[in-house]
C-alpha cells in the first residue's frame, strides 16, 4: 500500500462498490458515519465461509464444526487485539445498540437505584440515550446531561461538578460525535469517573472506524462499537468490558451456548464471553468482522486517522467557499473526526441531500438519531458528509461543486 507525502490512502480499488456508476457518473459516497463500504477481503471472507466452512460453532466435534469454531473464535481474538482488549472480555453483540442495552440491563438493573444519577451528554446518539431513559424510568434514577458548548465540545469542569455530588452511578459518552465530529477526551473522562467511584461506558461506534483505539489505555469499564461502520458487515457489534465487572454481571439473554448446566429449576452460566452470547452466534458476520479489522490493521489506524484528518481539513476549507453555508461543530480538523454537519441557509437539509443525489453525491440529512442535540443546536436537522479511508479530495470537490449548484438553484432566501 503506497502513500503520498501527505499520508493519503489509495485504497478505492479495494472497495467493489466504488466502481459503480449511476447514469454514467461515478458514485460519490460520503455517508460512512451511517455505514461504511466493505473491502473485497471482507466480502470474500464471508463468501468463503459459507462456501467451505459453514457449520454451527461451539457444538459439533466433527471437523467442519471445529473449523467454523476456529474461524469464529479466531476472528474474536483479532478483534480484541485490534483494540488492545482481552479475547474473553470481548463480547459479540448484534450491534452497538445491543451492546449498550446489555450494559443497561445486566449491569444497570443490579446497580442503579432511586436517587442515583446516570450521566450522559447532549451529543449522544439515541442508542446511548434511550437505554438509560428506560433504566431511569424503571429504577427511579435521574438522567442528567453534560452540555455541549457552541464549538461542539464538552466541559470537563461540568463533569467534575456532576461527579462531586456523589450520586453519579454511571457516565456514558461518545468517543466521537456522529453529528459534530467532536473527538472527546474519553480516557480523561473515564479516569475522572473512576476516581469518583462511578462506572463508565464509551460509545465507540464512530471512534473505532476513525481512530487508533486502545481500550486498555482508555480504561473505561465498557467500550461498545459496531462492525458495519468499521468496514465490517451489518449484524455484529462488540462490547469490551472490564473482567471483574463482567464476571459479576447476570446474563443479558437466556438460551443455548450461554449456559454451563441446565436443570429443571435453575441453570449455571458459561464463562466469559459466552455468558452474554445466547443462541447461535452471528458466525459469518464474525468472520467478516475479523477480515475487516485485518484490513484496517494492515492500513494502520494512525494512517487512517491522518488521511481522514487531512481530508476533513480540506473539506472544511472548501466548504468555507460555499456562500451561506455554516459548518456545525469544532472549527478545525484536529478536534474532530471525519464527520462534518452543515446547513445551507434557506434550504432544508433534505432538499440539499436530494439535489446532491442528482449528482450521485450521497450524504445524510436529518436528525442523525440525535434529536436532543438538534434541539440544543436550535435546528430541525442538518446535512452531513462523512468520510472513510476510500474517500479522496476529488470526492470533496464533487460535494462542493454540487452544493454550489444547489445554492444557485435555491438562491438567497
Residue ranges of each PLM-predicted region?
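Pyridoxal 5′-phosphate
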Residues: 1-413
Amino acid at each position: 500500500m503506497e502513500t503520498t507525502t501527505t499520508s493519503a490512502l489509495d485504497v478505492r480499488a479495494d472497495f467493489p462498490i466504488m466502481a459503480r456508476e449511476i447514469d454514467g457518473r461515478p458514485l460519490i459516497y460520503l455517508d460512512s458515519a451511517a455505514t461504511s463500504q466493505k473491502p473485497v477481503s471482507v466480502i470474500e471472507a464471508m463468501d468463503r465461509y459459507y462456501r467451505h466452512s459453514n457449520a454451527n460453532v461451539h457444538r459439533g466435534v466433527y471437523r467442519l464444526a471445529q473449523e467454523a469454531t476456529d474461524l469464529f473464535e479466531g476472528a474474536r481474538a483479532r478483534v480484541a487485539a485490534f483494540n488492545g482488549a482481552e479475547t474473553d472480555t470481548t463480547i459479540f453483540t448484534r450491534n452497538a445498540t445491543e451492546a449498550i442495552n446489555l450494559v443497561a440491563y445486566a449491569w444497570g438493573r443490579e446497580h442503579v437505584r432511586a436517587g442515583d444519577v446516570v450521566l450522559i451528554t447532549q451529543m449522544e446518539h439515541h442508542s446511548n440515550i434511550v437505554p438509560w431513559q428506560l433504566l431511569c424510568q424503571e429504577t427511579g434514577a435521574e438522567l442528567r446531561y453534560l452540555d455541549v458548548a457552541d464549538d461542539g465540545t464538552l466541559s470537563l469542569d461540568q463533569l467534575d461538578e456532576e461527579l462531586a455530588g456523589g450520586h453519579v452511578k454511571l457516565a456514558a459518552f461518545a468517543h466521537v460525535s456522529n453529528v459534530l465530529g467532536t473527538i472527546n477526551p474519553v480516557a480523561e473522562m473515564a479516569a475522572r469517573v473512576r476516581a469518583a467511584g462511578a462506572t463508565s461506558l464509551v460509545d465507540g461506534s464512530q471512534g473505532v472506524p476513525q481512530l487508533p483505539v486502545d481500550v486498555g489505555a482508555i480504561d473505561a469499564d465498557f467500550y461498545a462499537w459496531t462492525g458495519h461502520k468499521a468496514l465490517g458487515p451489518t449484524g455484529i457489534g462488540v462490547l469490551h468490558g472490564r473482567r471483574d465487572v463482567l464476571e459479576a454481571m447476570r446474563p443479558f439473554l437466556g438460551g443455548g451456548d450461554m449456559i454451563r448446566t441446565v436443570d429443571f429449576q435453575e441453570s449455571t452460566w458459561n464463562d466469559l464471553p459466552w455468558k452474554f452470547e445466547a443462541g447461535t452466534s452471528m458466525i459469518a458476520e464474525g468472520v467478516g468482522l475479523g477480515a475487516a479489522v485485518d484490513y484496517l490493521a494492515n492500513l494502520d489506524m494512525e494512517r487512517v486517522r491522518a488521511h481522514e484528518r487531512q481530508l476533513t481539513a480540506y473539506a472544511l476549507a472548501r466548504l468555507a467557499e460555499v456562500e451561506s453555508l455554516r459548518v456545525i461543530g469544532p472549527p478545525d480538523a484536529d478536534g474532530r473526526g471525519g464527520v462534518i454537519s452543515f446547513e445551507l441557509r434557506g434550504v432544508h437539509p433534505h432538499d440539499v441531500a436530494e439535489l446532491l443525489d442528482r449528482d450521485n453525491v450521497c450524504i445524510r440529512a436529518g436528525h442523525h438519531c440525535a434529536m436532543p442535540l438538534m434541539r440544543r443546536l436550535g435546528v430541525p436537522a442538518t446535512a452531513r458528509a462523512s468520510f472513510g479511508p476510500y474517500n479522496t479530495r476529488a470526492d470533496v470537490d464533487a460535494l462542493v461543486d454540487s452544493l454550489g449548484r444547489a445554492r444557485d438553484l435555491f438562491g438567497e432566501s
